[in-house]
């Protein structure tokens, strides 16, 4: 059974800031079934809920900064519960929180606490990976350590298939590894030249001093179906794993493209696969 397709609104964040509701309407017009938020831009949760219901698009989830959720989870998460989101997501870890640092153990415990707060509000916490979670701890990927430490009812996966591939792991196989624990999967495509990938996090709008120096044009995010990812295999893995949603995300457009056209091309490609 084909799964519904949502879009991570970070992909069109500048458009969201300029015209919040108009941009969500455009996502509906492009054929997206749902949206995943990346900020509410000062809009009222009740109004967002009503608008989504009116146009027939589902607010499935939201990326919420880790520290915001950790410091005041009930207040921060209640907005998304009011909107009607089923999921909230840890989207990214700053350098001091990551595996390989002294802060990682505290981060794992913090994620557990957020998961408990989310559960109390009727929300399910997910974790959205990058590539830095694929360092090993005692022979095991740090991402697997996170999932084996925090119980499944408090934390499920939001596997970003681009970053899994960048880390050198087969994304379809990794999605299936977490069958029954992968309700939402990020579809993201890319192309690269050479082995040195440059400052990848600049491309997602984050300044990260831990990155390598940039090699021009070595890496580019692409619309889904326009890069190196085996999208049909990933989609089949999502179905096999029992996923509920796939989410298109493109952190930055390819050269000479625009964010709106990027998400349009991604949706059109998925339609050619009858998704």
Regions found by a protein language model. Name each.
Residues 1-87, 156, 217, 236, ...:
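N-terminal pre-domain/capping segments
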Residues 13-18, 34-47, 64-72, 95-99, ...:
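Acidic-and-aromatic substrate-binding clefts and catalytic sites of carbohydrate-active enzymes
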Residues 243-273:
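C-terminal/domain-terminus segments
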Residues 24, 45-49, 73-77, 108-115, ...:
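Generic structural signal for well-ordered alpha-helices
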Residues 36, 61, 89, 126, ...:
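Conserved beta-strand positions in the central sheet of alpha/beta enzyme cores
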Residues 120-228:
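Acidic/histidine-rich catalytic cores of soluble enzymes
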């Amino acid at each position: 059974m084909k799964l519904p397709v949502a879009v991570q609104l970070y992909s069109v964040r500048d458009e969201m800031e300029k015209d919040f509701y108009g941009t969500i309407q455009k996502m509906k017009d492009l054929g997206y079934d749902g949206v995943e938020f990346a900020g509410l831009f000062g809009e009222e949760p009740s109004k967002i809920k009503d608008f989504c219901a009116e146009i027939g698009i589902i607010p499935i989830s939201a990326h919420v900064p880790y520290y915001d959720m950790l410091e005041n989870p009930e207040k921060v998460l209640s907005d998304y519960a009011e909107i009607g989101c089923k999921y909230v997501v840890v989207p990214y870890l700053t350098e001091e929180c990551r595996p390989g640092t002294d802060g990682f153990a505290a981060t794992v415990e913090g994620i557990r606490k957020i998961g408990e707060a989310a559960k109390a509000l009727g929300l399910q916490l997910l974790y959205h990976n990058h590539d830095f979670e694929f360092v090993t701890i005692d022979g095991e990927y740090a991402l697997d350590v996170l999932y084996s430490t925090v119980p499944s009812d408090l934390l499920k996966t939001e596997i970003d298939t681009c970053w899994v591939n960048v880390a050198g792991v087969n994304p379809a196989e990794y999605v299936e590894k977490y069958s029954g624990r992968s309700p939402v999967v990020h579809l993201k495509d890319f192309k690269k030249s050479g082995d040195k990938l440059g400052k990848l996090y600049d491309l997602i709008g984050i300044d990260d001093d831990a990155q390598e120096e940039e090699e021009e044009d070595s890496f580019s995010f692409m619309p889904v179906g326009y890069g190196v990812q085996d999208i049909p295999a990933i989609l089949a893995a999502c179905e096999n794993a029992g996923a509920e949603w796939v989410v298109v995300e493109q952190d930055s457009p390819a050269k000479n493209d625009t964010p709106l056209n990027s998400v349009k091309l991604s949706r059109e490609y998925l339609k050619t696969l009858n998704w």
